[in-house]
Amino acid sequence: MNLDDAEVFVPWSNLTLRKYDPVYADLTYYSFPKEQWIALLDALHPTLIASIGEWKENISDCDNFSQHAYYFVSKSFINAGYPCQGAFMVVWSRSHAYNAFVDTEGKIWIYEPQNNKIIGDIEGTLDDVYNPDKVWFPGEVKLLTK
């Protein structure tokens, strides 16, 4: 991620996010061009899979994948020494948890951490499983390890 390409994103003033019962841990985040988000997520996905393993109901399922993905993205910004985190969030629908990120155009893209795919724009036509109810910018999270 190149800070020269970043835009400061203030979620409190984003009208799209207000529709989804948002929770914000910080005042500002960085948005980046979509291509840079994809490159970061592609680079982090093997580490995510190595960390969480295969899908298992109730122990290693969608909420665990989305929270681990959030952790690895958050940690990459901390390790890079950036002054704030990327605009990457955990999102819940009625039946699923996944992630989303904000690009420099202000679009919010849904990301499926289980298969490393961009599902579509949060404002676009989505399957019910990806119809957001809640968005969460949790701030830095820590994974429990042995």
Predicted regions and their residues:
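A structural boundary/capping signal
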Residues: M1-K146
